[in-house]
């Protein structure tokens, strides 16, 4: 859960940097650096999230749990580009879409905090290595 929270925080910072920092300080080097850091966050979040599923979900329904996760993810892949496209058409700028993307990071951060609390309460061992 800690890696999920760190990745979420980085994601929030990167998208807010695109929304508010780059328009004030336009720099290709800064933009590339932010993209590279955003790539790190996109690695940390799934690296923390996917291994936690079998630690939380009973083995009998693990396949169904992965099915639900992929189902939700695919709905997001369908709807988010449509929403962002409509926002871009309405506003003509990228500030609001970047704020929307950073809000996804906020939701992930809240989920990470909740997951960490549940781990502490129920002892899932989410911070422990998978191989002993």
Could you tell me what each predicted segment is?
Residues 9, 67-75:
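Transmembrane alpha-helical cores of Major Facilitator Superfamily
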